[in-house]
């Protein structure tokens, strides 16, 4: 079968169209990923003057070298752009074989978990205002089996019923049910927009959400989430310095640290890997699926309760 001819400019237009479709469907993160890819690819074809050239395996290799040597982006960023290019190209009827010699996997990044005594130190650290809120949300993420920041930002009051939190992970769409531990309830009560409605700094936040992150709906709400994520990570870096993180051989805190810390502490506490994977809502753990027929949410909740008690975070 003859390979369909697609030019670089046609591919660029298709990437932008996919971004618009995801934006209209309110899949804002995916739309942003396509827009980022479009910006990068547009810079490349403008620099090469190749808008009307055919997109083929040689283009892929040259774009890959451009990202490596001229833009000097990280390897996972190179792979990120190529994956979204490939998805669009294949959707247009192109053959994925043109990408066969390009790196489109994800290289594991170095992650550092917090030891238990640092979690305790964070909990007792005297902080005020937004620093206190971001610290508490970090601890909530840890206690909630490594809940991602995006899931905390969009967590609704209606997701909490009968002593349990039930929500779907934004990343995978997978539903999770988690027992509400006392330490989690305390944080929710402290920072709920309903509790803070008399505070002028928090009075305009959406009362339907658990945390004062989002004021609006749709694209504007997503922009507010992105701003909050940036503020969260910036505050965590400052808090890391205050808590003396360097003394533990660590350099910083980020939104991913709580998730990795829960998994690591759970592993050191003797919790089976299958339970850790299920507790974190992973979607591609093939080996884990073998164990899950007998694994109930109650078992995972029991393990999490034991873990939080073992480090004195109740």
Label the model's feature ranges.
Residues 129, 233-278:
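Short, basic (Lys/Arg/His-rich) helix/loop patches that form interaction surfaces
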Residues 40-44, 69-100, 145-147:
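N-terminal DNA-binding recognition helix of tyrosine site-specific recombinases/integrases
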């Amino acid at each position: 079968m003859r390979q369909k001819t697609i030019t670089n400019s046609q591919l660029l237009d298709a990437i932008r169209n996919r971004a618009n479709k995801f934006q209209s469907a309110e899949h804002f993160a995916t739309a942003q990923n396509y827009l980022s890819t479009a910006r990068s690819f547009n810079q490349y074809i403008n620099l090469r003057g190749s808008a009307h050239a055919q997109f083929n395996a040689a283009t892929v290799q040259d774009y890959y070298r451009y990202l490596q040597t001229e833009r000097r982006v990280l390897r996972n960023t190179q792979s990120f752009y190529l994956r979204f290019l490939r998805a669009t190209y294949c959707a247009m009827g192109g053959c994925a074989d043109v990408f066969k010699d390009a790196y489109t996997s994800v290289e594991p990044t170095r992650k550092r978990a917090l030891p238990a005594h640092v979690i305790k130190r964070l909990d007792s650290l005297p902080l005020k205002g937004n620093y206190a809120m971001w610290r508490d949300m970090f601890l909530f993420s840890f206690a909630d089996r490594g809940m991602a920041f995006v899931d905390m930002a969009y967590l609704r009051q209606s997701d909490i019923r009968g002593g349990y939190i039930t929500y779907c992970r934004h990343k995978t769409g997978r539903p999770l049910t988690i027992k509400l531990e006392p330490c989690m309830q305390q944080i929710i009560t402290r920072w709920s927009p309903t509790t803070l409605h008399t505070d002028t700094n928090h009075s305009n936040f959406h009362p339907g959400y658990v945390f004062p992150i989002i004021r609006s709906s749709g694209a504007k709400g997503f922009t507010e989430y992105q701003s909050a994520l940036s503020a969260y990570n910036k505050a965590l870096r400052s808090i890391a310095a205050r808590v003396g993180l360097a003394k533990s051989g660590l350099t910083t805190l980020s939104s991913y640290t709580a998730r990795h810390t829960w998994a690591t502490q759970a592993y050191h506490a003797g919790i089976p890997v299958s339970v850790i994977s299920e507790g974190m809502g992973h979607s591609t753990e093939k080996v884990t699926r073998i164990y899950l027929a007998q694994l109930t949410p109650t078992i995972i909740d029991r393990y999490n309760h034991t873990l939080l008690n073992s480090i004195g975070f109740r």
